[in-house]
Amino acid sequence: MQENYKAKAYDILKNLNIEEGDLIEIKKGDLRIRGILLPSYSKDERIFVIKLDNGYNIGISIDNISEIKLITKNSSKAQESERKEVSRNGAKSEIKIISTGGTIVSKVEYETGAVRPALTTEEIVQFLPEINEIAKVDAEVLFSILSENMKPEYWVKIAESVKKAFDEGNTGVVIAHGTDTMAYTASALAFSLRSLQGPVVLVGSQRSSDRPSSDSAINLLSAVTTAKYAPFGEVVVNMHADSSDTYALVHRGVKVRKMHSSRRDAFQSVNDKPLAKVLWKERKLVMLDKSYMSKKGETTLDAKFDNRAFLLYYYPGLDRDFLEHILTNTKIRGLIIAGTGLGHTSSDYVELFRKATKDGIFIGMTTQCLFGRVNMNVYTTGRQLLDAGVTPLEDMLPEVALVKLMWVLAHEQDLEKIRSLMISNLVGEINPRHTLDLFPRWSYE
């Protein structure tokens, strides 16, 4: 397993029967360094990569090394051999792991210190032999992109891969994805894949795998646990539940949002309860919400999107000419507004919206508040917008409404049919009943 090392570094390891995953000690001058030998992705062929006890990875030049000693062999060789056999034959796997990129599948370039989305999911599994205690897995690298570069055409490819995984006999699918646009992809898959045979679990990481505070391992273990044991057939997001490593939460894919830029527990269910929590140490899934979609016999694929849709975040002073240009001088077929409060914009745009809806453009209203639902019957401006043809979208998140509109536009041309689908609760994107416990509160006592 020294194939990641070349030239002199490879020869040294081969002569000492040292393989990746072994615990070794290196003496260099007065310094003794002990750690686990990792694969090297350095362009410098004279670098060993070691994981220290404190969790950090370091690169050590082979120059001036006085001694390299094997301490213990990798104890997971038998499990690794079994994992390779599983990977060679997808039919033997229970859970398919599909990698699309992001921090959870990242590596460090030791020349620059930069983190790049290039480490495959299989290589992560190599350093998480515990996964084999949960389920037999098979890994596929679909593509390796930063999540900000995600596009609707990639959603289609992911959906097709999920469908294929179920057709091959897998009972669950895990999708490794960057966290920034994970909620968009989760929504796209929820509308594209119906009658799911098992869970489709999106998972990511807020901290790269080289950092001691990384959430990669726990999130991936939790995701595989969810894919293995969950009773539902839904698209979900599985991420850290708190700032420690206690447990993970499983969120419905169309009711979740990344609510913090860097915290490990950044993802929260909005206007909904999490479906489950995962006690990752015990490999146990605890259901929190019984109103889930049950597994079906055969997954249906219907993945197509029309991206002639626009998400407008309303703000005071929005230039009317700018908005008019979007509605009249582009190929736009639909507009989702993230409005203020109960679903408002300035009344200055009412006639502009009226003309657009008469021209066949769908306009849907969501709220910037995120929590709560739109109610455009309370105030005068809301009623004026309703009269102009703006459609209230209940408690749908703005991003979910946008993805749903892209999916609907690809299936319907008639405005009334588009409206009918947009206000229909297709995959749990609308929660008809809100309770007090759905809104998070912060206590300063």
Swiss-Prot record:
What does UniProt list as catalytic? 103, 179, 180, 258
What is stated as this protein's family in its record? Belongs to the asparaginase 1 family. GatD subfamily.
| A Pfam family the protein falls into | Asparaginase_C
Q: What is its EC number?
A: 6.3.5.-
Q: Which HAMAP family match?
A: GatD
- Output the lineage of the source organism: Archaea, Thermoproteota, Thermoprotei, Sulfolobales, Sulfolobaceae
Name listed for the protein in its UniProt record: Glutamyl-tRNA(Gln) amidotransferase subunit D
Enzyme class comes to: ligase
Which parts of the sequence belong to the Asparaginase/glutaminase domain?
Answer: 93-425
Which GO MF term does the entry hold, naming one?
A: glutaminyl-tRNA synthase (glutamine-hydrolyzing) activity
Name the gene that codes for it: gatD
Report any one BP term from Gene Ontology: regulation of translational fidelity
| Entries under SUPFAM superfamilies matching the protein | GatD N-terminal domain-like, Glutaminase/Asparaginase
Record's function text: Allows the formation of correctly charged Gln-tRNA(Gln) through the transamidation of misacylated Glu-tRNA(Gln) in organisms which lack glutaminyl-tRNA synthetase. The reaction takes place in the presence of glutamine and ATP through an activated gamma-phospho-Glu-tRNA(Gln). The GatDE system is specific for glutamate and does not act on aspartate.
Keyword line: ATP-binding, Ligase, Nucleotide-binding, Protein biosynthesis
Q: Which organism is it from?
A: Saccharolobus islandicus (strain M.14.25 / Kamchatka #1) (Sulfolobus islandicus)
Q: Which domain of life is it from?
A: Archaea
- Subunit description: Heterodimer of GatD and GatE.
Q: Which InterPro entries match?
A: AsnA_fam, Asp/glu_Ase-like_sf, Asparaginase/glutaminase-like, Asparaginase/glutaminase_AS2, Asparaginase_C, GatD, GatD_N, GatD_N_sf
Which reaction(s) does the protein catalyse, per the Swiss-Prot or TrEMBL entry? L-glutamyl-tRNA(Gln) + L-glutamine + ATP + H2O = L-glutaminyl-tRNA(Gln) + L-glutamate + ADP + phosphate + H(+)
- The answer to whether UniProt assigns keyword Iron-sulfur to this entry is no
